[in-house]
């Protein structure tokens, strides 16, 4: 796993107490040039200390410190001398553990809030006396623990920040990791560099060196099979493994029949000719579609596709002779969204939740703890083509989760044509790299329309386009009206069985980016 070989390098650990955005904390720390990992809150103290972290951050979470079964830590951690920053629930836990008082508020404080800095403190050094921050909490600290000073407050939160510099213990009730706290990154940097004394020398280049060495240790003299999709994730994973083991890597590209228009041919050209890797093309489209016949539940679709993927790779491995490892381009958001002990499952990812328990190949997931923007930087550093590095994310289950309900050949053809128009027009408008994802969704219901002099009863197409940095939060893209008009007009006129186009203007949260 990434980071296991970084015992002698500086690392800041984020203890996960269950908030869905907790991985953003690790991302912001890495943006400051400090390597960070998120680990379970109940990781044994000896394991935490063995990592020799320069600092520890307690994340937010949905629990109340007084709830039965609320997440707890070994209180000896406070006496370890390691600097600790508690965020939201993390600060409340610190206050509760060390003798402060936490109470339930009559109402939640949620959203943008003005923070008044009330005392000198390393976290706020050089910042204005009043700054905007993002709050999301029900409980609040009414009295800090002995030895702590209150360093900030808001209109509804008397202890919005507190610190005990002598023990290097700090807490903030707001969320510095989100962009709605404009000075949040500066606050985190002050904790990292002023309090923890970090150097900030982690980089993409150092990651590549560490990961190549880790892959070589894991693989030894074994042979490796890569699950290649042509997307940036599997492409960068393949390039990393190829750098580590060379021609002992065979890339298998499976056409599951759920790809976009022209995608199978494009991937074969790009990787077989341009990158010089061993590519095996497998057309398993009929097999996948037969398995999906009659299946309407999105979770079942994902698990069926994940299961069949692994089975196909196992069959190819047997054809190739001895193969020991399987590469997947699993990313950090995949792991987080598939659920941890303290975070509810949003949806299972085919790279994570759908793997058969009797899988015969050992997994290599070199990108498992990277965010998408970090993966792109790794890809550029490895010299991958721009059209691969900057390709928009595409889900492993493909169009199966953009067709609501049962997947049929007819629906696939409808969606392929509509999706191709969306991509073509977004590119033509020069917005492709600015938008995180832009695609079409085919719902299962139909609506009434009029085309010519005839009444129609046909499918709508849902247009989805979002902006994001990491897929953990996303906002709907404010596409120009004339662009929306062109997309709608072309789809209705060029794609049969479609009589309506609607635009999804829901952010994440409360929605997810994909519809299934």
From Swiss-Prot:
Alphabetized SUPFAM superfamilies for the sequence:
Adenine nucleotide alpha hydrolases-like, Class I glutamine amidotransferase-like, GMP synthetase C-terminal dimerisation domain
Q: Does the keyword ATP-binding apply?
A: yes
What is the main EC category here?
ligase
The regions listed as transmembrane in this protein's record are none
Q: Which reaction does it catalyse?
A: XMP + L-glutamine + ATP + H2O = GMP + L-glutamate + AMP + diphosphate + 2 H(+)
Keyword tags: ATP-binding, Glutamine amidotransferase, GMP biosynthesis, Ligase, Nucleotide-binding, Purine biosynthesis
Record: active site: 88 (nucleophile), 175, 177
Give all residue intervals belonging to the GMPS ATP-PPase domain: 202-391
Q: Where is the Glutamine amidotransferase type-1 domain?
A: 11-201
- Describe, as the record does, how this protein assembles with itself and its partners: Homodimer.
Pathway listed? Purine metabolism; GMP biosynthesis; GMP from XMP (L-Gln route): step 1/1
Superkingdom, taxonomy of origin: Bacteria
The free-text function statement in the UniProt record for this protein reads: Catalyzes the synthesis of GMP from XMP.
Q: Which InterPro entries match?
A: Class_I_gatase-like (IPR029062), GATASE (IPR017926), GMP_synth_C (IPR001674), GMP_synth_GATase (IPR004739), GMP_synthase (IPR022955), GMPS_ATP_PPase_dom (IPR025777), Rossmann-like_a/b/a_fold (IPR014729)
Annotated EC: 6.3.5.2
> Per its record, how is this protein called by name?
GMP synthase [glutamine-hydrolyzing]
Name the gene that codes for it.
guaA
Q: Which residues of the sequence carry a binding annotation for ATP?
A: 229-235
Q: Which GO terms describe its cellular component?
A: cytosol
Which Pfam family, just one, is annotated for this protein? GATase
Q: One GO molecular-function annotation for this sequence?
A: GMP synthase activity
């Amino acid at each position: 796993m990434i980071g296991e070989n970084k015992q002698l390098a500086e690392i800041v650990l984020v203890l996960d107490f269950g908030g869905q955005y907790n991985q953003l904390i690790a991302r912001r720390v890495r943006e400051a040039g400090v390597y960070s990992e998120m680990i379970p809150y109940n990781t044994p103290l000896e394991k935490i200390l063995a990592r020799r972290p320069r600092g520890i951050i307690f994340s937010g979470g949905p629990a109340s410190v007084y709830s039965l079964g609320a997440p707890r830590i070994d209180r000896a951690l406070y006496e370890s001398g390691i600097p600790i920053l508690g965020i939201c629930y993390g600060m409340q836990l610190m206050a509760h553990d060390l003798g402060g008082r936490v109470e339930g508020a009559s109402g939640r404080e949620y959203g943008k809030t003005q923070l008044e800095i009330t005392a000198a403190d390393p976290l706020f050094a050089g910042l204005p006396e009043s700054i905007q921050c993002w709050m999301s909490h029900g409980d609040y600290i009414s009295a800090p623990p002995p030895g702590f000073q209150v360093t900030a407050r808001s209109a509804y939160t008397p202890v919005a920040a507190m610190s005990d510099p002598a023990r290097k213990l700090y807490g903030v009730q707001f969320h510095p990791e989100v962009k709605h706290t404009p000075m949040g990154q500066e606050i985190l940097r002050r904790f990292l560099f002023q309090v923890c004394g970090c150097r900030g020398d982690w980089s993409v280049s150092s990651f590549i060196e560490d990961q190549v060495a880790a892959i070589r240790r894991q693989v030894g003299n074994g042979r490796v099979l890569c699950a290649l999709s042509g997307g940036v994730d599997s492409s960068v994973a393949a390039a990393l493994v190829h750098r580590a083991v060379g021609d002992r890597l065979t890339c298998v590209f499976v056409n599951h029949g759920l790809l976009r228009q022209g995608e199978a041919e494009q991937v074969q050209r790009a990787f077989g000719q341009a990158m010089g890797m061993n590519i095996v093309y497998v057309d398993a489209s009929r097999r996948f579609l037969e398995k999906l016949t009659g299946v309407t539940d999105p979770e079942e679709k994902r698990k069926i596709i994940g299961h069949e993927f692994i089975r196909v790779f196992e069959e190819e491995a047997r054809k190739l002779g001895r193969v020991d490892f399987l590469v997947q381009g699993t990313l950090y958001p995949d792991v987080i969204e598939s659920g941890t002990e303290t975070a509810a499952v949003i949806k299972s990812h085919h790279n994570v939740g759908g793997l058969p328990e009797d899988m015969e190949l050992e997994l290599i997931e070199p990108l498992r703890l990277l965010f998408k923007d970090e993966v792109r930087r790794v890809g550029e550093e490895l010299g991958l083509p721009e059209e691969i590095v900057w390709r928009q994310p595409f889900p492993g289950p493909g169009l199966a989760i953009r067709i609501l309900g049962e997947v049929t050949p007819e629906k696939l053809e409808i969606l392929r044509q509509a999706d191709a128009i969306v991509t073509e027009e977004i590119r033509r408008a020069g917005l492709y790299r600015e938008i995180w994802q832009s695609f079409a969704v085919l719902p299962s219901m139909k609506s009434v329309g009029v085309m010519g002099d005839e009444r129609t009863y046909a499918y709508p197409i849902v247009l989805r386009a979002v902006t994001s940095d990491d897929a953990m939060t996303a906002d709907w893209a404010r596409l120009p009206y004339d662009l929306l008009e062109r997309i709608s007009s072309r789809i209705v006129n060029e794609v049969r069985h479609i009589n309506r186009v609607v635009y999804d203007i829901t952010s994440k949260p409360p929605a997810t980016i994909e519809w299934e």
